[in-house]
Regions:
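Intrinsically disordered, low-complexity segments enriched in small/polar residues
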Residues: 1-60, 64-67, 75-128
Length: 128
C-alpha cells in the first residue's frame, strides 16, 4: 500500500509516470475522396481499425505506465501507400510533446507529418 501511495505522489507526475497523453491521427490527404485506414495498438491495447475521411481525426488518450515503456504504433493505409510507425514512444515522443502532452500526426500525400500544436508540422515518415 505504501508503494502505491508513493508512486502516485506529485513527484511521479513530474517524472512523467502516470502522465496522461493524447494522440491524434488526422486525414490530411489532398483528395476529398481518399479514405485513410488506421489501426493503432500497444502491447496491451488494440484500438481497432478506423476509416477516416478527409479532415477526420482519430484520437485516444492514455497514461504512461510505471516502467515508462509505453509504446503505441500505427499501421496507416492511404490508397497505394502504407506505413507502420511509432505514434507514441515514451522515450522520444514524451520529451518532444511534454509541454502540450498531445501528439498530432497528419497523413498527407507526401508522407506522415508530426506536430505538438496541430499548427507547425514537420515530415516524420516517408511512404514506403
Amino acid at each position: 500500500m505504501a508503494f502505491f501511495v508513493l508512486g502516485r505522489s506529485s513527484n511521479a507526475y513530474i517524472f512523467g509516470i502516470f502522465q496522461e497523453y493524447k494522440v491524434h491521427i488526422i486525414n490530411d490527404i489532398s483528395s476529398k475522396s481518399e479514405q485513410v485506414i488506421v489501426r493503432c495498438q500497444s502491447a496491451d491495447n488494440d484500438l481497432g481499425e478506423h476509416y477516416l475521411n478527409k479532415g477526420d481525426d482519430f484520437h485516444w488518450h492514455f497514461r504512461v505506465n510505471f516502467f515508462r515503456s509505453t509504446l503505441f504504433f500505427c499501421h496507416v493505409k492511404a490508397g497505394e501507400n502504407e506505413k507502420i510507425f511509432n505514434a507514441f514512444n515514451v522515450g522520444y515522443i514524451s520529451s518532444t510533446c511534454e509541454d502540450t502532452s498531445t501528439c498530432f500526426w497528419a497523413v498527407r500525400d507526401e508522407g506522415i507529418f508530426f506536430s505538438c500544436d496541430n499548427e507547425n508540422y514537420s515530415k516524420a515518415y516517408q511512404w514506403a
